[in-house]
């Protein structure tokens, strides 16, 4: 299965479910009236598109219907696709233009940080890049060992300290090692943290500061890993993390496991943070660049 087929298949469940619900709605109406728009708004919300974003979509759709004189609900679908595509904007990919590029990976436990790091490292090494992974989740038992397994599978290198050591020191050493060894990319793991754990959020600020200092002049990406199956809770996480970190992109995992997925639109619309990568399966090569066109 080729790259585009794989990502299309991975998000098929999400796309087909959303459009299936919309198609059912379109087929059940013979005219476009206020009842139609109310039903459409409810349908979008059920697909995990936030309330405000759903309202905005319907507002834009009302304008298009009026301006273009659309009478038949069946003609709405193309306009709906256009509005959503405009909300998602241009695809934004990770910037690998500098050497090293530093990627800080953050998020709560269980969202898929470790597997995302392993898959990303594997993808980059397969492209001929030299990758160093910083094992800066020093708080959780076995986190370093778990990451080591993924790094070995990916054919990358790891910089690690003992459990309980200072995470910022691990990041500092990893970036220093990358410079010394001529590595292309440094991927930094971090402890899974919740918004109400102030000490962990403070630690994240410290790590971010170290990254900026050590990687001055280099591309620095901060990727927030979110579990697509958690719906609106993922949006809340993104809002809270963005208060602490300068998030440059979202990694949306487990997208193959949800029939909703409107979360992508909501995050982009409400927070202005692009989804850069999506996890669409369990295999090591099931991490893809997000494509609004395929979505």
Give the ranges of each region predicted by the language model.
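Compositionally biased, charge-rich terminal segments
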Residues: 1-8
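Primarily NTPase-proximal linker/entry elements flanking Walker-type ATP/GTP-binding cores
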Residues: 13, 17-136, 143-188
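Short hydrophobic/aromatic residue motifs in ordered secondary structure
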Residues: 51-53, 140, 256, 284
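Short beta-strand segments
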Residues: 106-107, 189, 225, 279
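Conserved catalytic-core segment of NTP-binding enzymes
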Residues: 166-181, 195-293
